[in-house]
């Protein structure tokens, strides 16, 4: 997505949350008018409590831990495995920041090594990189052959929020 669109997914997420026309924005303001802005403060690391964004965007965040375990499972490798439960049990909050007890350091080291091995053995593997390029080329060609105008903004790097949520499997394949 980012390779074609040239916009980071974090920025796209913030744009969608703040756009009054999106379903997510409408759902959030039903709960609290300030909720969209508060979520964006967390996503952009501007929240007053660092712990709030460290959980979702740091070297030891939920997203990284999730995709490592999920990708290790999906690829059938053991490279991305680490002791998630142990890490979670040893996490602490100190001065509004996330910390790890010393007894959890070996689990953190395993996590770091899992990331290292997954990058070198899976994510940066020549086959994986060539598939990435082939998928990009497929979408470019598919959009031309099917004359799908909804792909134009993506391929031109000018994708609006409306264009983004119009890109669904129905428009692609039917």
Please identify what each model-predicted range represents:
Residues 2-174:
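Histidine-centered, transition-metal-coordinating active-site segments
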């Amino acid at each position: 997505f980012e390779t074609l669109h040239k916009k980071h997914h974090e920025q796209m997420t913030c744009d969608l949350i703040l756009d009054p026309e999106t379903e997510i924005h409408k759902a959030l303001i039903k709960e609290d008018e300030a909720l969209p802005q508060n979520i964006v403060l967390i996503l952009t690391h501007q929240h007053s409590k660092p712990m709030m964004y460290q959980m979702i965007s740091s070297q030891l965040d939920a997203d990284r831990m999730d995709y490592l375990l999920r990708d290790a499972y999906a690829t059938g490798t053991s490279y991305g495995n680490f002791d998630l439960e142990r890490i979670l049990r040893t996490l602490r909050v100190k001065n509004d920041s996330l910390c790890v007890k010393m007894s959890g350091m070996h689990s953190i080291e395993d996590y770091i090594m899992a990331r290292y091995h997954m990058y070198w053995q899976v994510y940066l593997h020549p086959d994986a990189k060539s598939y990435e390029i082939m998928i990009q080329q497929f979408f470019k060609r598919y959009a031309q052959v099917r004359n799908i105008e909804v792909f134009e903004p993506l391929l031109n790097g000018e994708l609006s929020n409306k264009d983004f949520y119009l890109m669904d499997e129905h428009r692609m394949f039917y």
